[in-house]
């Protein structure tokens, strides 16, 4: 089409500038360019900065292109050409150079043919996929041979050589790779065994792990020549925390026992790269098929599909993706989702639905009459249009983007390349296709919401319409017999005044006009209307300029109901929703909202949540972890408010959530450090990082509250003479210091989703003046020779919350030895009582007639000090007392060991739990932790009696 359009002025200017640069760089080569293709050259370099810069960098490409642009069978020779080029390559550096040069050459060829309409969409997608497969497989083959020379050939028990199979996932697996794309891979090998023929034998798992690491580096690492592909390995079993390579047997066990819906979804497109080279390919295929395609019509997938639909909508709102042709409403993702949903549901019974290609699947759906032909036509046409647009958009500058451009030059480039006279015409065509796709998407997947909303009384419509007239509002309130009408009217008038200061478009005003009468009808009659209305309207004002959130509440009555319920129950939750309105998405599914993640699944769920974000995009990774935390806090609080979780379970959930986040942050910080410096060499033959995080206080005692800080200490076990193995080599201990600094930074950086946790590291050896991270040996020495009694008290509530087995064992040994050492009773009593007195002076209640639940006599802190004192006093003879770090189980253990009587232990536990429960309730209500002094009298007296019995009182007690 572009050949029939006159080149726009803006494009001509860009073409002239690009041609001038090319003329300056390669005048002699440019002179050899065929004159009949001069106009084509100018057009293409005006359309694509990638092509223009590639030709400037490598003038020989001009000669090569003039000979090969019309070679239709070109892609079939990729592997043969690469094999020839690599035959004389001597080392990994040469390999990387050859791969990058070949990729650039072929990507220019593909982009050129795309911009000049010489290739169909199907041809272009196939060429891109074949090129990636060729680069992967020839790099693999070269590296496999090199690794066999270095370490021997991996074999099974029968002595047969074992290959590593590379599974291409996503669009690569489907043969539909886009122009600038990550490649999602999974590595596997048929059987365990050992290498033979090397200097020393090595387990197959170790051989293939090293091979996989070198393959990723060959493709992914940026060099002077660029890179080939961003390699994403997070779709493998267990994600980042799993082994890089797994045997068939381990792979099968994982998918049978732990495979999840999204992994079935991902595995639909899985394809073995270069499968014709491997006799073991069919075995792998047969093994995976039952996991992906169930033998029966799998309607159980429908609920999972609805959840995925909700995730798509959330993604659009979260990242402002309305102009994203992949993730926006009606985008490429929705077409893929429709096709793959039919594959998941019916693929077990219908072999024709097991194809990897999307257009192939749509054709099968048409043949099986699973959708009306008209709907399938809309999907096919929309998909082809958007995929072509996506490729051209990315080929402008070889950038991975699906967001429509803002720059006029890029807009006119796209319009011209797509065959449209101007940007507006193209944009209207985009909207037409995406609207058609979205209609099909909504029709097929459906929604759990009841579309029929109840009619809102005219009084509430009038209340909102007349919300500038106080007298009218008061009259309506009187007619409705609304409680506390004056305060409610004041809130409504204040909301209107705030909204008048904001720029609301016609759409936003229309949505508010529909939404607010419904909001008022639900809140105004409530006994607690004043407080609830103030909280809900504050949130609505906050999101007023973000129409998608208003629509979410307006179109989902159940979500609005959940919002009101939660805001009524807890000012803390209301404030959280107001600060982070992205959490409104969580209200769409009450079953999900009121059922927190199982304790043992926080880590897996967070890994899955982060898998959608490129590892190198640290800003988005940080944001995603915070969003995940906020969503989980909301779910825990919702279950708490609903009475579905007792206090201990709430703390368990908050603690396990914190541990999962700590693991994710450590992994993120480690990736950043390792990329820059490599890893300390003492880890070469060891799993783990040689790094530990010790949790103290509430996190150490499984007693976190909603707003708790994390008290932590960092440890490592790096020997003194160790260095890292990266290009920028540093001392191993310096590496761990920088790692700890990075972790603290990742936790404390404030993003749009807030701070992750407040981190307190003052409990480390020597406090604020000490090193941020210590070796286990120096930690041990400090605890033995320099630590104060209060630091040993703190150690009672300490446990390792992140770390590998050697460090865990080492820390546990240090903790037990310190806690069980013999102590002089009188000195210990003096130290503990003195410290408690200092705390009470500084932190105790100054309010007459009030009891401070935490710091006043007989309160929580007295109970904690009793537990710590008794552990330190009696662990020398009863080492079992050191087993637990939480107060409840410490008291249980004391009763078992007869350190306390059963009645004393029960009384302390009961007092501790009821006071914690009240602190927790006050936190949810956003209130200080003080109660009338007439409360908890019995509990306080009991605590003080036990204190008097076991601790010698100081003169001020």
Swiss-Prot record:
Enzyme class, one word?
A: transferase
Query: Which intervals of the chain are annotated as region Adenylyl transferase?
Result: 457-957
The prosthetic group or cofactor this protein requires is: Mg(2+)
Q: What Gene Ontology terms describe where this protein resides (cellular component)?
A: cytosol
Q: Which UniProt keywords apply?
A: ATP-binding, Magnesium, Multifunctional enzyme, Nucleotide-binding, Nucleotidyltransferase, Transferase
Entry's InterPro entries?
A: GlnE (IPR023057), GlnE_rpt_dom (IPR005190), NT_sf (IPR043519), PII_UdlTrfase/GS_AdlTrfase (IPR013546)
Name the catalysed reactions. [glutamine synthetase]-O(4)-(5'-adenylyl)-L-tyrosine + phosphate = [glutamine synthetase]-L-tyrosine + ADP; [glutamine synthetase]-L-tyrosine + ATP = [glutamine synthetase]-O(4)-(5'-adenylyl)-L-tyrosine + diphosphate
Adenylyl removase: region residues? 1-449
Highest taxon, organism lineage: Bacteria
Please, one GO biological process term?
regulation of glutamine family amino acid metabolic process
What the entry lists under Pfam families is as follows: GlnD_UR_UTase, GlnE
Check the record and name the NCBIfam families matching this protein: PRK11072.1
UniProt family annotation? Belongs to the GlnE family.
Q: What is this protein called?
A: Bifunctional glutamine synthetase adenylyltransferase/adenylyl-removing enzyme
Q: Which gene encodes it?
A: glnE
């Amino acid at each position: 089409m572009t050949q029939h359009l006159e080149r726009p002025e803006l494009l001509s200017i860009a073409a002239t500038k690009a041609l001038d640069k090319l003329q300056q760089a390669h005048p002699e080569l440019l002179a050899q360019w065929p004159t009949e293709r001069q106009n084509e050259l100018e057009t293409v370099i005006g359309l694509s900065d990638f092509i223009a810069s590639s030709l400037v960098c490598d003038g020989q490409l001009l000669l090569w292109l003039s000979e090969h642009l019309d070679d239709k069978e070109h892609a079939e020779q990729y592997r043969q050409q690469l094999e020839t080029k690599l035959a004389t390559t001597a080392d990994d550096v040469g390999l990387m150079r050859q791969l990058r040069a070949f990729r650039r050459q072929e990507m220019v060829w593909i982009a050129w043919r795309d911009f000049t309409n010489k290739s169909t969409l199907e041809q272009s997608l196939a060429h891109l996929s074949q090129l990636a497969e060729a680069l992967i497989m020839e790099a693999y083959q070269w590296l496999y041979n090199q690794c066999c020379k270095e370490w021997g050939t991996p074999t099974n028990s029968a002595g047969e050589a074992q290959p590593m199979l590379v599974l291409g996932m996503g669009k690569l697996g489907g043969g539909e790779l886009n122009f600038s794309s990550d490649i999602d891979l999974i590595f596997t090998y048929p059987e365990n065994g050992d290498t033979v023929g090397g200097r020393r034998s090595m387990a197959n798992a170790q051989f293939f792990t090293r091979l996989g690491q070198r393959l990723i580096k060959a493709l992914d690492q940026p060099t002077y020549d660029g890179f080939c592909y961003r390699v994403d390995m997070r779709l493998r079993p267990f994600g980042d925390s799993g082994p890089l390579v797994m045997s068939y047997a381990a792979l099968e066990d994982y998918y049978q026992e732990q495979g999840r819906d999204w992994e079935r979804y991902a595995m639909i497109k899985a394809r073995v790269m270069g499968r014709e080279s491997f006799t073991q390919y069919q075995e792998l295929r047969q093994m995976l098929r039952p996991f992906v395609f169930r033998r029966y019509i799998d309607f159980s997938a429908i609920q999972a599909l609805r959840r995925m639909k909700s995730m798509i909508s959330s993604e659009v709102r979260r990242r402002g993706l309305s102009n994203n042709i992949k993730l926006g409403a009606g985008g490429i993702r929705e077409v893929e989702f429709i096709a793959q949903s039919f594959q998941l549901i019916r693929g077990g019974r219908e072999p024709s639905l097991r194809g990897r290609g999307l257009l192939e699947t749509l054709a099968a759906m048409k043949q099986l009459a699973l959708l009306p032909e008209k709907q399938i036509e809309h999907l096919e046409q929309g998909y082809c249009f958007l995929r072509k647009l996506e490729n051209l958009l990315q080929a402008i500058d070889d950038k991975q983007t699906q967001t429509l451009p803002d720059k006029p030059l890029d807009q006119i480039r796209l319009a011209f390349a797509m065959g449209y006279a101007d940007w507006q015409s193209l944009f209207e065509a985009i909207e037409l296709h995406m609207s058609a796709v979205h209609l099909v998407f909504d029709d097929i997947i459906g929604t759990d919401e009841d579309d029929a909303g109840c009619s809102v009384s005219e009084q509430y419509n009038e209340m909102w319409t007349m919300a500038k007239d106080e007298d009218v509002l008061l009259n309506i309130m009187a007619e409705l017999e609304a409680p506390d009408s004056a305060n409610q009217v004041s809130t409504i008038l204040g909301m209107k005044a705030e909204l008048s200061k904001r720029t609301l478009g016609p759409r936003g005003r229309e949505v508010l006009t529909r939404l607010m009468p419904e909001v008022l009808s639900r809140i105004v009659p409530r006994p607690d209307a004043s407080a609830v209305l103030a909280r809900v309207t504050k949130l609505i004002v906050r999101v007023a300029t973000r129409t998608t959130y208003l629509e979410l509440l307006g179109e989902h009555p159940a979500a609005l109901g959940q919002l009101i319920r939660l805001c009524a129950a807890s000012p803390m939750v209301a404030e959280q929703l107001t600060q982070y309105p992205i959490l409104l998405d969580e209200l769409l599914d009450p079953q999900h909202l009121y059922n927190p993640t199982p304790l043992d699944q926080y880590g897996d769920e967070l890994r899955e949540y982060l898998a959608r974000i490129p590892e190198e995009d640290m800003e988005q990774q940080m944001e995603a972890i915070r969003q995940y935390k906020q969503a989980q806090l909301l779910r825990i609080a919702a279950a708490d408010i609903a009475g579905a979780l007792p206090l201990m379970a709430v703390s368990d959930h908050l603690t396990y959530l914190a541990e999962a986040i700590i693991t994710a942050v450590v992994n993120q910080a480690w990736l950043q450090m390792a990329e820059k410096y490599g890893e300390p060499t003492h880890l070469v033959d060891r799993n783990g990082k040689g790094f530990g995080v010790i949790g103290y206080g509430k996190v150490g005692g499984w007693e976190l509250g909603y707003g708790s800080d994390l008290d932590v200490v960092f440890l490592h076990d790096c020997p003194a003479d160790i260095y890292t193995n990266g290009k920028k080599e540093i001392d191993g201990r310096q590496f761990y210091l920088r790692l700890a600094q990075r972790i603290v930074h990742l936790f404390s950086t404030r993003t749009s989703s807030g701070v992750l946790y407040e981190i307190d590291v003052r409990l480390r050896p020597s406090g604020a003046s000490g090193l941020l991270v210590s070796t286990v040996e120096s930690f041990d020495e400090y605890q033995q020779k320099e630590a104060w009694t209060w630091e040993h008290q703190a150690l009672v509530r300490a446990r390792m919350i992140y770390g590998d087995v050697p460090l865990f064992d080492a820390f546990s040994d240090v903790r037990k030895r310190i806690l069980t050492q013999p102590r002089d009773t009188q000195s210990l009593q003096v130290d503990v009582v003195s410290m408690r007195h200092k705390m009470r002076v500084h932190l105790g209640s100054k309010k007459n007639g009030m009891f401070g639940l935490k710091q006043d006599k007989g309160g929580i802190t007295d109970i904690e000090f009793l537990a710590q004192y008794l552990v330190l006093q009696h662990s020398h003879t009863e080492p079992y007392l050191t087993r637990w770090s939480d107060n409840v189980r410490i008291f249980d253990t004391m009763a078992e060991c007869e350190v306390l009587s059963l009645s004393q232990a029960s009384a302390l536990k009961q007092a501790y739990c009821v006071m914690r429960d009240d602190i927790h309730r006050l936190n949810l209500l956003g209130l200080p932790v003080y109660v009338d002094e007439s409360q908890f009298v019995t509990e306080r007296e009991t605590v003080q009696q036990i204190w008097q019995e076991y601790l010698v009182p100081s003169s001020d007690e």
